[in-house]
A protein has these predicted regions:
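Structural preference for solvent-exposed beta-strand-turn elements
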Residues: 1-274
């Protein structure tokens, strides 16, 4: 869905069995799509695209499947409107489809009510098109994939405690990454990690998994429960920590999971309950 969305915005993407070749068009190079962009079941996709398109000089409609059209969008629409974005949607912009009319954006100081990488990332993308320095403050650190990717492309970010600062209209420092290797998804690996932990006699190694510390709360919880988990061959790819995860079966004990671990464990709670 993300690839089709950018193709509809005029980006050339060549796909082969093992890689995508993307021909960048620069900050202002996207073009108005001929119809609505369908984000399917991707909440991340529709929210990040809303931020990206808020500063463009054309009109876009973003929609998704039935479940996406029921999910709340107000948490990104409200701060984007504060930046000057023109966004309309069902229930005053609370629900998709969202109609985004590109506008001249201005920097804001925004304090997010929740630790949300989707809110943060939508605002960081919009901030690239805004006049001035945008500040985004979170109550706790959320996933930082966007910040790491920005920095790998030479986009300057600064952190002051729980606040991120980014300057709009960056004119220097950009660099095209000749090759990005996307590590294995930790949420997908979580099922094998738990399975190997609870099935007697297991000894499993899962290779090339992203182990970003803002994503791996499950490892912290399982280790406290007595799991036998090792991170091998640790390295960094495109700013992201990567490792091979070796898991051997172990007897576990119950633990209490506090609010400090919720953001980095949220997607793994169903399998953690097993």
């Amino acid at each position: 869905n993300t690839m089709r969305a950018f193709q509809s915005l005029g980006v050339r993407i060549d796909e082969s069995a093992e890689e995508l070749r993307i021909y960048g068009k620069g900050l202002w190079g996207l073009t108005e799509p001929s119809g609505p962009i369908d984000c399917g079941n991707s909440g991340t996709g529709i929210r990040l695209l809303t931020g990206l398109l808020a500063g463009q000089d054309f009109f876009t409609v973003l929609t998704g499947d039935e479940s996406i059209r029921r999910r709340p969008m107000g948490r990104i629409v409200k701060p984007l409107r504060e930046m000057g974005a023109t966004i309309a949607g069902r229930k005053g912009g609370e629900l998709a489809p969202l109609a985004v009319t590109g506008s001249r954006l201005r920097a804001i100081n925004y304090t997010s009510p929740v630790a949300s990488a989707q809110i943060k990332s939508a605002l960081l993308l919009a901030a690239l098109f805004a006049e001035g320095t945008t500040r985004v403050t979170e109550p706790r650190l959320s996933r930082d994939h966007t910040e790491r990717l920005f920095q790998s492309f030479g986009i300057a970010l600064r952190r002051e405690g729980s606040t991120l600062l980014i300057d709009g209209h960056p004119s220097v420092g950009w660099s095209a990454a000749p090759r990005l290797v996307v590590p294995g998804d930790f949420s997908a690996a979580a099922f094998f990690i738990v399975g190997a932990t609870i099935i007697p006699g297991s000894d499993v190694t899962i290779q090339q998994v992203g182990v970003n510390p803002t994503r791996t709360g499950l490892l912290d919880v399982l280790t406290r429960m007595g799991a036998d988990i090792q991170l091998l061959n640790q390295r960094e790819e495109a700013g992201e920590p990567v490792a091979d995860i070796r898991v051997r079966s172990a007897r576990l004990r119950g633990v209490a999971v506090g609010p400090d671990l919720i953001p980095q464990t949220i997607d793994e709670f169903p399998i953690l309950c097993v």
